[in-house]
Amino acid sequence: MPFSANQLDELKVLNHYSQPSSMTGIKIHHDAAPEMIEAAKRLHEKGLTDHQDGGYLTDLGCEALENLQALERLLA
């Protein structure tokens, strides 16, 4: 099953976090690409971040980022 465009956008936003930690946050500004703003909102709705505009990763978000980074290493 291929990733949807929305899922790829969510992965891009998630990948902006430098490490799987609740101590490092990001901010998606109002002038960012609309698809990135929407992706950040969806990540928040799914419980991966603590704010609609990025914020900090939740425990679930940290786990997701760890898995994303592991996948990137496998594909490199």
Which role does the model predict for each range below?
Residues 14-17, 51-52, 60:
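Surface-exposed loop/turn and secondary-structure junction residues enriched for glycine/proline
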Residues 33-37, 51, 59:
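Generic alpha-helical scaffold signal
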Residues 53-76:
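Accessory beta->alpha helical hairpin/"wing" motif in late/C-terminal subdomains of nucleic-acid enzymes
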Residues 44-54:
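A short, conserved structural fragment
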Residues 1-38, 42, 70, 74-75:
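Short amphipathic alpha-helical interface segments
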